């Protein structure tokens, strides 16, 4: 048995999702009495200049670089086994070796497709368990390596995709994607309506605009939706201060129809009272929506994992996918007027959601390494037994 194991969680700042999952896992380990947990942006620390450039290109994929990103995502998938793997496997290796030598972790977890650790295992024979926590409702080959001990995935659909490309089924566990604990709490909605000055007798449309211009024509959309009777529009601008200031002028014209916010710390509160939400199809956002059964309208998915996520939720009946700006208003208004469809989408979200994903992942990892949590017993004996 490993007493007080040290856990190293590797992540990357491409969007907020991977880091958020890493932090959620870190908090869950600490809640279970495992205090020695390190979160590291391996690529950012190893090659900050290259990382800044690639992050910039990633953000540009939302606006001017969609075709470029399509070629990258699907092109890498095709040639990955031949050329990319060797280069990518060694990216961040120097920093990684220093981390392993100095910190001496007992467990390594990846919330971003970093294969430097399993590749190092393969080349040097070091013995350290490696776990990959996939953060989308699809899989890219870049996540896969023979030296990864276990994969934690969102759904049985992802598991099937992985089995199809040769990953042994016993190495894959369906747990859901880790989300912030606030999304799994019981909250009195009356408190939320009062806090945000929302009306219980009206439908609420939540628009998550984001900080990087990923949702276009927000002001025009708000103007259109403000004319819809018995509807309140709530816009979360994130850290996009320019957008917030632009929309506040609209809010001043009709503060009952439009509510504008910047960064919202407890955004789960708005999820709980919204009738439906317009957003981008990131894996973490969709997992949070599933946890609270929020019907989603997915705005112009970027080719790659966003598009794969969107297609999955659309096929399950949990989402409406918008691929052209001209469709947003008409399709959203139609959905808001269709209570039967909204209820069906909520039920579809409920069928996708797996409760307490972070807890199940942490319990399973600790059980497999014979490092049971201090103070708190394992929540899922059945899951833990599958690792022994």
Swiss-Prot record:
Its EC number is 2.4.1.315. Processive glucosyltransferase involved in the biosynthesis of both the bilayer- and non-bilayer-forming membrane glucolipids. Is able to successively transfer up to three glucosyl residues to diacylglycerol (DAG), thereby catalyzing the formation of beta-monoglucosyl-DAG (3-O-(beta-D-glucopyranosyl)-1,2-diacyl-sn-glycerol), beta-diglucosyl-DAG (3-O-(beta-D-glucopyranosyl-beta-(1->6)-D-glucopyranosyl)-1,2-diacyl-sn-glycerol) and beta-triglucosyl-DAG (3-O-(beta-D-glucopyranosyl-beta-(1->6)-D-glucopyranosyl-beta-(1->6)-D-glucopyranosyl)-1,2-diacyl-sn-glycerol). The keyword Iron does not apply. Pathway: Glycolipid metabolism; diglucosyl-diacylglycerol biosynthesis. Its main location: membrane. NCBIfam families: PRK13609.1 (NF010135). The keyword Transferase applies. One of its GO terms (biological process) is enterobacterial common antigen biosynthetic process. It is found in: Cell membrane. GO terms for molecular function: 1,2-diacylglycerol 3-glucosyltransferase activity. The gene is ugtP. This is Processive diacylglycerol beta-glucosyltransferase. Belongs to the glycosyltransferase 28 family. UgtP subfamily. One of its GO terms (cellular component) is plasma membrane. It catalyses: a 1,2-diacyl-3-O-(beta-D-glucopyranosyl)-sn-glycerol + UDP-alpha-D-glucose = a 1,2-diacyl-3-O-(beta-D-Glc-(1->6)-beta-D-Glc)-sn-glycerol + UDP + H(+); a 1,2-diacyl-3-O-(beta-D-Glc-(1->6)-beta-D-Glc)-sn-glycerol + UDP-alpha-D-glucose = a 1,2-diacyl-3-O-(beta-D-Glc-(1->6)-beta-D-Glc-(1->6)-beta-D-Glc)-sn-glycerol + UDP + H(+); a 1,2-diacyl-sn-glycerol + UDP-alpha-D-glucose = a 1,2-diacyl-3-O-(beta-D-glucopyranosyl)-sn-glycerol + UDP + H(+). It comes from the Bacteria. It comes from Bacillus cereus (strain G9842). Keywords: Carbohydrate metabolism, Cell membrane, Glycosyltransferase, Lipid biosynthesis, Lipid metabolism, Membrane, Transferase. InterPro entries: Diacylglyc_glucosyltr_N (IPR009695), Glyco_trans_28_C (IPR007235), Glycosyltransf_28_UgtP (IPR050519), Pro_diacylglycrl_glcsylTrfase (IPR023589).
């Amino acid at each position: 048995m490993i007493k007080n194991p040290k856990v190293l969680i590797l992540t990357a700042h491409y969007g907020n999702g991977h880091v958020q999952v890493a932090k959620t896992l870190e908090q869950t380990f600490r809640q279970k009495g495992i205090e020695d947990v390190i979160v590291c942006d391996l690529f950012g620390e190893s090659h900050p200049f290259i990382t800044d450039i690639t992050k910039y290109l990633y953000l540009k994929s939302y606006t001017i670089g969609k075709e470029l990103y399509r070629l990258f995502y699907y092109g890498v998938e095709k040639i990955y086994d031949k050329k990319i793997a060797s280069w990518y496997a060694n990216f961040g290796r120097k920093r990684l070796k220093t981390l392993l030598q100095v910190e001496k972790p007992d467990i390594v977890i990846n919330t971003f497709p970093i294969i430097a650790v399993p590749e190092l295992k393969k080349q040097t024979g070091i013995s350290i368990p490696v776990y990959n926590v996939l953060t989308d409702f699809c899989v890219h080959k870049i996540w896969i390596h023979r030296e990864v001990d276990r994969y934690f995935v969102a759904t049985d659909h992802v598991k099937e995709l992985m089995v199809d490309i040769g990953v042994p089924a016993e190495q894959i566990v369906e747990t859901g994607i880790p989300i912030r604990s606030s999304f799994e709490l019981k909250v009195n909605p009356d408190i939320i309506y009062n806090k945000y000055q929302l009306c219980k007798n009206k439908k609420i449309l939540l628009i998550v605009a984001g900080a990087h211009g990923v949702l276009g024509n927000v002001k025009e959309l708000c103007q259109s939706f403000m004319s819809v009777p018995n509807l309140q529009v709530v816009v979360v601008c994130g850290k996009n201060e320019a957008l917030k200031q632009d929309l506040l002028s609209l809010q001043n014209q009709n503060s009952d129809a439009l509510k504008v916010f910047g960064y919202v710390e407890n955004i789960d509160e708005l999820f709980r009272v919204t009738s439906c939400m317009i957003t981008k199809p990131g894996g973490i956002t969709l997992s949070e929506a599933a946890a609270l059964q929020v019907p989603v309208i997915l705005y112009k998915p970027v080719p790659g994992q966003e598009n794969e996520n969107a297609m999955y939720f659309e096929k399950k009946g949990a989402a409406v996918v918008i691929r052209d700006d001209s469709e947003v208003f008409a399709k959203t208004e139609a959905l808001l007027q269709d209570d039967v469809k909204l209820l069906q989408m909520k039920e579809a979200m409920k069928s996708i959601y797996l409760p307490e994903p972070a807890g199940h992942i942490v319990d399973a990892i600790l059980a497999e390494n014979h490092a049971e949590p201090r103070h708190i017993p394992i929540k899922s004996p059945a899951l833990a037994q599958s690792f022994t």
